[in-house]
Amino acid sequence: GERLEGTVMFADLRDFTPFVETTPPEEAISGMRAYFTAMHRAIRLHRGLVLQFVGAEIEGVLGVPVHLKDHSDAAVRAALGMRRALKELNRQRSIQGKSAFAHGIGIHSGNVLAGNSGSDEQSAYALIGNTVNVASRIQGLTKELGCDILASQETVEQLQGSFRMDKEPPRLVKGYSRPI
């Protein structure tokens, strides 16, 4: 493994468990696949890497393992692309008479430990560390704040481009010693 700097993002479909419980299995899997495909494309378009899909959540990273000087900007652009992709997916779902999806995206920049993780029999490229945990916690805050994209102060301070953002007061998140 190696220590690298990058921007980690998590996106999670909101209220997906009730959807799965009340939807035929084929439709639930098809909907999730359509969502993941659209989000994967948006992340890749902005030079990101999708690390894993877990349940209704997707984990991505920008700047790792391939260095990107503007990884924070790329992550915010990817999140905006994900917003547009979800809007288009929901337009298609509406035409088909299906309910709309909503999601939250958390973004955090910092150092990660990157490398192959797992067992002797099965491993995958993974990121470990506080940056990953905080990005996940920030995604969780999107529900509380009623927003679809939320970036940490560390990410915002690294931005080189201009983005319209609303500032939120710092908040404590589980597993992190200071407010973000």
Question: Positions of the model-derived regions?
Answer:
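Catalytic NTP-binding/metal-coordinating core of nucleotidyl cyclase/transferase enzymes
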Residues: 2-78
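Short loop/turn elements that form and flank the Walker-type P-loop nucleotide-binding site
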Residues: 2-5, 100-102, 121
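Activation segment
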Residues: 20, 62, 116, 159-160
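Alpha-helical scaffold within the catalytic cores of cyclic-nucleotide enzymes
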Residues: 33-48, 64-105, 130-143
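Acidic/histidine metal-binding catalytic segments
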Residues: 54-55, 94-106, 148-155
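Catalytic strand-loop-helix junctions within cyclic-nucleotide turnover domains
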Residues: 61-71, 105-125, 141-145
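Allosteric regulatory "coupling" segments in signal-transduction proteins
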Residues: 72, 123-128, 167-171
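Cytosolic regulatory/linker segments at or just downstream of nucleotide-handling modules
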Residues: 112-114, 135, 141-180
